[in-house]
Every structure is written in structure tokens, then in C-alpha cells.
Amino acid sequence: MIYDDENRGRVWEPDPQMQAPQMQAPQYSPQPDPQQAAAMERRQRKQFSHVGMAAAAFMLITLAAQVVVMVLVMLLDSLLGDFIDFYGFSGRMLMSSLPMYLVAFPAVAGLLQLVPKCGSPQKEQWGFGRFAAFFVIAMGIGLAGNILGRLVGILQPSGPDSAELDQLIRNSNVWVNLLTTVIMAPVVEELFFRKMVMDRLLGYGQKAAIIMSGIMFGMAHGNFSQFFYAFGIGLLWAYVYAKTGKVGYTIGFHMLFNLLGGVITVELSKGAQGLTRGPWMIRQIE
């Protein structure tokens, strides 16, 4: 089309690339479907329930296996007499720990394979400084939680309910403590409470998965006095796994934590009290 410029008397043609302005339709965010939201909530509750039942099965199978082991020990003791001291502190430590790690864990790991995974952890790369900072935080949480648990235990009419476990650890052979508390416990507990549990909950929110892992880890320790520090430590290590996706990191944290708190500190304390003979950390075999 030709336009006449009345002011200058010139003729010009419009640029073919010029377009008339167009009105944009208003954008509306889609409203969530109430039925889909309700279905998602049901799936979430079902997933959390299945994981919780697996944790309960872990404790029940452990208890049942411990009873079976005790019955077998009584039979062996009646046959062998005093040939093996099953009822010493080291024997009791093994009878308490091995059913959990060698019987209950494989059984519950198989059950959890029936629960589909949901979500995945992040893949952050951490440096040594951050790991060191988190370990210092873990030691602080462990100390504060232990103090709180002991204060609560003192208020109980029966006294602290962790006293028997403390006695077992303090009086067991150092090699038994290394096997159970430094090697087996960190590997089994981190694989279960961090890897297996969180891989099935992270899809419903990182915070929910971390809190659930911490609560289950605290309750798995079996007494109220130990719940506080185990819950706090469980939260911290669950956070580490959620951010890095490396269960090996949390196993390493757990091993070092138990080595310092459950072996080195105990052996130094026994040495100071004259309960250890021979080289450092080597207890006399009775």
C-alpha cells in the first residue's frame, strides 16, 4: 500500500517486516487437580508406611533372632560345659549384635526390594574442609545429645536405660568392640537407614526423608537415653547422603565416630583405671 506524506509530499511504502501489534491472551496458571493431589498424598502415606513397617520388622526380626541365639547358646553350654564362656561380656556383645547384622539386616533388605525407589539424592562434590566441619558438628551433636539423654535417664525411676550397653562396651574385648561397633554397625546401619530408606523417600521431599531417617535411626537404638544423640547424628548423616549421594561418606563418618567414642575413649578410660594391661588398647584376655 502507498501512503502519501502530506507534510512532505513524499510517497513511501511500509516495511514488510512490520507487523501490527497483537493482543496477548492473559496467562492463567493451571489449578491443581484435587483428585491428583489426593492420589499423591495416598501414595506418599503408603510409601512412608511401608518403609516404617520395614524398620519395625528390622527390630522384631533382631529380637527374634537374639532369642533363638540365646536358646542355642544354652544348649551348647549344657553340652560343652565351661569350654566356651558364652555369658561373658564379649559373648553377650556378640549375641546381641550378630543377630541384627547377619540375620535381620539381610531379611529386611530383601523386604525393602518390594518397595519401589522414589527420588534420588543430589550429587554435590564436597572438599576436605566441609567433611571436617561436618565431623566436628557430629561430635558436638553426639556430646550434647548424650548429656541430654543421661539427664533424662537420671529422672527415670529405674535410672538410665543405657547403663547395660555402656557396661557391655566397657568390659568387652577391644577386638569385639572393633568388630561390632566400628565395622559391622556403621556398614549395616548406614546401608539401611541412609541408602535403603532414603532412596525410597526422597521423591516426597528432602526434608521429610531426612527427618524420617533420623527418627528411625534414633528409635533403632532401643532406649530413650540414646535416642537424642542418635536422632541428631542420624539427621546430620542423612543430610550428608541427601546432598552427596555417597553412602560411603556416611559409613566413614559413622566408623570414625564409633572408633573415637566407643573404642579409643573406652580403652583410654580403662587404661587410666588400671583395667588394661600390655600394649595400648590391648586388653588382657581373661
Predicted regions and their residues:
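Short helix-terminus and kink motifs of transmembrane alpha helices
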Residues: M70-M74, N146-R150, R194-K195, D199, ...
